[in-house]
């Protein structure tokens, strides 16, 4: 659910990230790594659901690792450089790979503790929401729209408000203003000017690394 939801809401990939995003960053999205990666992810998720039906609650945890390990990678095949890193979740290769840890590597440490707390609240709410009702919507083929739109603050803000509304409908009373510091930090104002009753605001945008 988290993989698909993050994919369909690019604001979650970019709002909390560092300045280095894109295919050669430390935490590329699935659709930034290889062109066929999303298709392979859909097949992998289908296999996970089939195994869940087959094994039920007794499904071996290493099946998730073996199914996703070669998909959650960057362009070089590095399993650590991925938006969702499962290196330390449940790898059967070594004991250090079976720590039950899921790394969200696109999350940069924010400059204030309260910004970190509200991020944690967001993650807890999304996990709770998908625990009750798994996310099964089809993956969106963003194509070039991903970097054409979601490097800009207006599109990130609009998409993130959809996430807030989704959580509110699920019973979590989220307020988008809680994340105003994150927007100001990620897309700082360069300058503003008022002309004939019109206001022009110029902000920094993101730039993908290729």
Feature map (PLM): residue ranges:
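C-terminal accessory/tail domains of diverse enzymes
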Residues: 1-210
